[in-house]
């Protein structure tokens, strides 16, 4: 009986501790949606479309097509 009561108290304490230390996420999605809507209107604003560090035509790529902006690599970007 004592062990059961101690387990119940421990679970309640840990549950309360989780709620007290959690981040306030009430406005999390509210701030996310306007940014997503802006990226849908302007696809160039999306971070996924940006290719930082890619080589233009004539740049050395070895055999890794991911290094070229055109994704075509034959030792040199084409």
From Swiss-Prot:
<keyword id="KW-0960">Knottin</keyword>
<keyword id="KW-0872">Ion channel impairing toxin</keyword>
<dbReference type="Pfam" id="PF02950">
    <property type="entry name" value="Conotoxin"/>
</dbReference>
<keyword id="KW-0638">Presynaptic neurotoxin</keyword>
<keyword id="KW-0732">Signal</keyword>
<feature type="disulfide bond">
    <location>
        <begin position="68"/>
        <end position="77"/>
    </location>
</feature>
<feature type="signal peptide">
    <location>
        <begin position="1"/>
        <end position="22"/>
    </location>
</feature>
<dbReference type="GO" id="GO:0090729">
    <property type="term" value="F:toxin activity"/>
</dbReference>
<dbReference type="InterPro" id="IPR012322">
    <property type="entry name" value="Conotoxin_d-typ_CS"/>
</dbReference>
<comment type="similarity">
    <text>Belongs to the conotoxin O1 superfamily.</text>
</comment>
<dbReference type="GO" id="GO:0044231">
    <property type="term" value="C:host cell presynaptic membrane"/>
</dbReference>
<feature type="propeptide">
    <location>
        <begin position="23"/>
        <end position="53"/>
    </location>
</feature>
<dbReference type="InterPro" id="IPR004214">
    <property type="entry name" value="Conotoxin"/>
</dbReference>
<keyword id="KW-0964">Secreted</keyword>
<keyword id="KW-1015">Disulfide bond</keyword>
<protein>
    <recommendedName>
        <fullName>Delta-conotoxin-like S6.8</fullName>
    </recommendedName>
</protein>
<comment type="function">
    <text>Delta-conotoxins bind to site 6 of voltage-gated sodium channels (Nav) and inhibit the inactivation process.</text>
</comment>
<keyword id="KW-0738">Voltage-gated sodium channel impairing toxin</keyword>
<feature type="disulfide bond">
    <location>
        <begin position="61"/>
        <end position="73"/>
    </location>
</feature>
<keyword id="KW-0528">Neurotoxin</keyword>
<dbReference type="GO" id="GO:0005576">
    <property type="term" value="C:extracellular region"/>
</dbReference>
<dbReference type="GO" id="GO:0019871">
    <property type="term" value="F:sodium channel inhibitor activity"/>
</dbReference>
<feature type="disulfide bond">
    <location>
        <begin position="54"/>
        <end position="69"/>
    </location>
</feature>
<keyword id="KW-0800">Toxin</keyword>
């Amino acid at each position: 009986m004592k062990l059961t009561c101690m387990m119940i108290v421990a679970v309640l304490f840990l549950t309360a501790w989780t709620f007290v230390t959690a981040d306030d996420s009430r406005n999390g999605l509210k701030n996310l949606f306007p940014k997503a809507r802006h990226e849908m209107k302007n696809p160039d604003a999306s971070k996924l479309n940006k290719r930082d560090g890619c080589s233009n035509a004539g740049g050395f790529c070895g055999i890794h097509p991911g290094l070229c902006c055109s994704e075509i690599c034959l030792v040199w970007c084409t």
